[in-house]
Structure formats: structure tokens, C-alpha cells
Amino acid sequence: MHPGGQAILFATDLDESSSVNAQLCELRKDGTMVDDSTQGGELEASEAGAEARHHWTELAQRILDAQDAYYARDAPTISDAEYDRLMVELKKVEDDHPELRTPDSPTQRVGAPQRITDFAPVKHLERLLSLDNVFTRDELSEWMNRVATAVGKIPNFLCELKIDGLAVDLVYRDGQLVSGATRGDGRIGEDVTANVRTIAAIPRKLTGDDVPRLLEVRGEVFFPVADFTDLNAALIEAGKNPFANPRNAAAGSLRQKDSRVTASRPLSMIVHGIGVLEGHDFPSQGHAYDKLAQWGLPVSPYFKIVEHVDEVHEFVTRWGESRDEASHQIDGVVVKVDDVSLQRKLGATSRAPRWAIAYKYPPEEVNTELLDIRVNVGRTGRVTPYGVMRPVTVAGSTVEMATLHNAFEVKRKGVLIGDTVVLRKAGDVIPEILGPVVELRNGTEREFLMPDHCPSCGAELAYEKNGDKDLRCPNAQGCPSQLHERVFGLASRGALDIEALGWEAAIALTDPENQRPGDDEVAEELPKRQTAVLSSEAGLFDLQLDDLAEIKVWRRRKVNGGPGPWQLEPYFFTKATAKKPSTPTATTKKMFDELAKAKSQPLWRVLVALSIRHVGPTAARALATHFGSVEAIREASVEELAGVDGVGEIIAESVKRWFEVDWHQEIISRWAAAGVRMADDRDEAPEQTLEGLTVVVTGSLEGFSRDEAKEAIVSRGGKAAGSVSRKTDYVVVGENAGSKETKARDLGRPILDEAGFRYLLENGPQGITTIG
């Protein structure tokens, strides 16, 4: 403890996955470790089995290498998730072979090693500890139970977001900022005072009349997610390597020799701990945060003090589903005992406090190999490059493809085929390739070249107008890729909702030879090419079961885990045998049932199904509500179309152009002849009881599916939102509502049950009774 100072055990928001936890020291060939900074540090590895010793050595070296890349070079070569996995595995080896666990082990060390750098060393007034991690809810509950047992009660907990940034220690004397240093090894860091002074969020002088004589605070410097893309674009434009993620951008921006470079970057900071403090004593973590804020220091707007264990889990759930709402990247939640006297009672181990824990979310960012970049032709002709990656699990699902949007985006991100790339997937968000791990390049990578002809039909690609970034295939009518994309799109839940008409079925109808092998891939002569049963979506509702009996698709079966021979197999019918004739599959029968039901779908769904560029469900609803029929929309002028609320000039011009194309008229006429509904009954239009209101539905309702609830809101003039904010007018909660209900209560938004929702739909907000 600093002389005359109060040592407050507020842990910093640091963990093994984002810090160096082992001293970089020499690993001997026999598995022992040499470290001149400790006495008796040699591991008695001879006592362990040879296999365990070898495994320990490999794991330790991988961790040390990862730490060196992460901290010394600000260029991580593995993901946080992979680092966590290695540490967990190393701990298990040491649990099984305790003789391998010494003070020199990566599992026992805290912080980054001291290396020769461009920055002077600075000794922290009070040592920075790390945090222990848990990865499951059961582990989190076990930790809270241990705390409750140790202190004799369930204490209040302070929950806060775990910032994925760079740890920094600040020292103020008589209210003036005198020092800023990186975390280093927890005792000694790097002097980055000049750079810290350029960060607007960090006050050079504390405010208030009672500023302490001496204050040491800890926090995280981070790069706002919203500014990350622009930074990388500027770096690539200048011929420099991009950063893999915002955390790397924060570290690289702060550890600059020239503070003017740091000043040019929009860094920010959040303070979450105190090392040394003179003249003040706080009863709780929450009180400390209040006072730090009064002194002008930036504290997190995302913390909450709770009284019950269930509330801790609710906080974890709420932010696990809303990670992208924070201004900074997060990879978990830190849970701390709020009462400082209980913190002191619980104490700390050599590396982490016992009164705080970090719950780690499943990783949203992982590293994987970019195997190839290919292009896809969409339903409106847009040609989109996408990355094909080595399959990897991220945010709970396996991902092997991610869009790259256009050639300009590929160049802006700076990715090459063969790169190790950082892949991000937040919840249900589409996977995104953030950028390359440049340090892992070996010279075999190659640049992606955008094709100049359509890979599906061979038409020359072109930009629709000057300034466009998207190349398009102009052969809308004859391009097989555009056709099967349109057929697949019209069957989606947001259009005609034909579940049995999926991606493969759409290809089988429009381009059954899509996967046809080359002559050199088969032993026998290939059969004659099939003719597609659909050359336009116009014929979709004229299809008969017999039309599909002979459709076959190419499949390549696996043999012993590897590629086997190509086979031509029936798609919509079963394969005939000596005992059973070929018959329609259950899915095929379901598809025809759903096609029949689709004929009665409301007008707005038919408009979406027509694949008019820019016309999605929102614009389609607006057009259907205003005009009431396809014929009225076709006859309307651009000015009349643009005058509809929610449409505008761009959509209006797109609609008008679509109706001017001859073969589009065939779609409308053949669908109408087949019985597809082309007009809404004007008497059916519900009263606009929700006009101007934003409603969020969460949980399961007995009388509505999720889509039905959304449609009920929109058809009555309301907006069906997917997340709760201060602008939300009502939140409807059903069974298992989850974090959205919690957030609604936090923000004081009116909450309705299903009965209240029905009342709102019928009568509007007048006289409604809320349940929260």
C-alpha cells in the first residue's frame, strides 16, 4: 500500500484472454522453465509423466507466444476464445499433475512481461490484479454461492460490462493528471502519459472541491465500434495494414511514438477501479463510481447494483442478447461484491480478487482461414463477393461463409485469399469478416479479382450508373442465378411464406444442372442436360405434380469421409425400386399445399414476391394499404407513388420501371389467372389504432405467432420494433420474455400482457391498463 494511502480492492476489468499472464522466459527442452526473477523457479518436471510434461511445454509455449503477439506487438495471432481454451487446458494439466504448477507457470502469473520498448517503465502505486473467469451459468452460480457462504449472506452485487480494450493506470496528484501507464506485468507498465493526455474522455484536471491529494485509477481505453471501419479504410488508403478488431486499434493507437497519431484517433476510456486513494473512504463500489463521476472521470453507463442472484443472471442474459448496443466491444460481464468491507473480508489470491469474477460470453470473434472468395448473383442482378472459410464456431453456430458486399469492400478490408481473418458474428447478425491477421501471412496469399462477366449466364457485368459500387448482371430474364434467387425469395417468410420451397428446391425447379460435374470428374459419359421446368416465376402457380416427376439433381456422396462418385438423383419424387414406384415426397406434397394457400396471401406479400427492387415488407405494406390493388399501383404515376408515406422517390421510380417491363406483365397475368390474390378487400383494412406507436413483442403469446403479432401491429399503423429503447411506446410480454422485459422495466417503458395487447390493437392507447 502506498504510504499514507488507502488500498481499495477494486479489481480492474482484466482477464487472461486479454492480457499477458505469464512471464516471457526461456523454456528448456526438458520442459522446465528458467526465470531469473524468481528463486527456485525451476519446475520439477521429471516428477511428471513424460507425456504430461511434453503437453504442458507445448501449451505453455503457445500461451507465451500468444501473449507476446498480443501485448508486445499489438498483433494477436489467435482469438480470445482460443487463448481461453489453451489456459483452461493448461490448468487441467496442472490439476492432474500439481508438480507442474509453480509461480512461473502461465496460470499463476499476472500481466505482461517487461520488454525493451519505446516507452519508459513506470511502477504502479498499487499492483493491478487480474480476474478469474467462468464460462457457464452454473460456474457463475457456484461462485456466488461460495461468496455467500464466506460472508454469511447473499451480498449486493455490482454487475458491469467487461470492456474489450487496453488496460491503463492513471495517477492524479492534487487533482492534476501526472501519469498514464499501460498495465504491463501488474507492477510495472509503460509510460504513455503524453498519449493519454490526448484522449478527450480523460480529464487533465479533476473537478469538484474535495479532490483527493492522491488518486490512482484503473480503466480500459477502447476504440468505439462505430469508428473502427472508418479507421481501417483510412489505413488501407494510406497503404498501411488494417487492424483486425477495435481492441487492436485501441492498443495500436495508444502505443504510438508520436502522440499526434494518438490524438487523431477517437479513443475513449471507462474507469472501473481504484488503486490508491488518500483522504476518502467509500462504503461500496457503487458509491466509488458516483464519486469518480463527480470528479469528472468517465465511468460506465452500463452497470447495475442488484440484490438477488437471479438479477445477476438477468443482467448477463440482457447484455448477452444486446452486446452491440454498447459503444465499445464487450466479451462478458464482471460481477463484483458491492460492499467494500466484504471485499476486504474475502481478500484475494496471488493473481485475482475472490470478490469479483468475469463471466465470459461465447466468442463473437474468432480467427479462421479465408479459403476462397467467390461471387453470388442476387435476385435483382447484384453481384456480391463472399468469403468461403474453414468452418468455425462463433456465437454458438458454425460459420463457413460471409458476405464481402462488393469489390470496394474487399479492397477496403484488405483481405487476401489465404489470409487468416477475424470473423465476427453477434447473435443473429450476419457473419462479418472484419479484416486480416497480417502478421500470419506467409507470401502464398493472393488478391481477389472481381469477374467482368456473370458466372451464371455469361453476360457482361456493368454498373447501373456512375458512382455505384455494385456490379450487376443485366440479364434479369435469362440469368439462372437471378431466377432461382427470385423463386427462393418469393417463398420466404417475409413474402408468400412457402416453407417447403427452400433453396435447393428453387434450384431444382430453375437450374437442375447447377451442380453438374465436369467430364473429367466422372468415369462414364454424362447424360443429356435437363431442361428446367421453370424458365420464369410466372409459371410457378401453374406447376402440376407430374411436371416434377423427372427432375433430378447432382449429388456427390461421401465415401470414408472423402468425396465419392457423382450421382443423379430425383429431387421431388422418391427413387423407384423393384417393389415401390416413384412417388412425391412429403416435402413436395407440402410445397403444393403451401402454393395453394399462398394464392390467398394479402396484397403486400404478393408485392414482395414480385422482387421489385427496393420494395420490402415495409414499402409493400404502405403501397398495398394506399392503393389496394396491383392494377392501381401499375396505373399510378411516380409522383403518386412517391407521395405514399414510407415509399419516397427512389422506391417509386423502381416500382414504375418494374411495371414497364413486358415479361413482368406475364408474371402478373399468369399469377392472376392461377388465382393469386391481386387486390385487398378495402373493407378488410383494420382501423389505424396504432398510428405513430412503436411496439415491441417479446416472449411467446398464445394467440399470435411472432409474424402474426408483427403483422397485427403494422397493419394498424404501428411500428413493430425488434429491440427496446426509450422511444418504445409499449412492450408486450409473453412467456419466457427474457431480457427485453428487463430492459423495458429499467427504462420505465409501459408493459402489456397479451390481453392488454389485444385491447391496444382494437382500441388504441386510450384507457389501456399496463402491468408494468
Curated annotation (Swiss-Prot):
EC number per UniProt: 6.5.1.2
Top-level taxon of origin: Bacteria
Similarity remark: Belongs to the NAD-dependent DNA ligase family. LigA subfamily.
GO BP annotations listed: DNA repair; DNA replication
Keyword line: DNA damage, DNA repair, DNA replication, Ligase, Magnesium, Manganese, Metal-binding, NAD, Zinc
CC cofactor: Mg(2+); Mn(2+)
Record PANTHER family: CHROMOSOME TRANSMISSION FIDELITY FACTOR 18, DNA LIGASE
Reaction(s) this enzyme catalyzes, per UniProt: NAD(+) + (deoxyribonucleotide)n-3'-hydroxyl + 5'-phospho-(deoxyribonucleotide)m = (deoxyribonucleotide)n+m + AMP + beta-nicotinamide D-nucleotide
Cross-referenced SMART domains: BRCT (SM00292), LIGANc (SM00532)
One GO cellular component, as annotated: cytosol
Positions bound to Zn(2+): 454, 457, 473, 479
Top-tier EC class: ligase
Its job: DNA ligase that catalyzes the formation of phosphodiester linkages between 5'-phosphoryl and 3'-hydroxyl groups in double-stranded DNA using NAD as a coenzyme and as the energy source for the reaction. It is essential for DNA replication and repair of damaged DNA.
NCBIfam families from the UniProt entry: dnlj (TIGR00575), PRK07956.1 (NF005932)
Record GO terms (molecular function): DNA ligase (NAD+) activity; metal ion binding
The protein's name in its UniProt record: DNA ligase
Residue span, BRCT domain: 685-772
Positions of the catalytic residues: 162
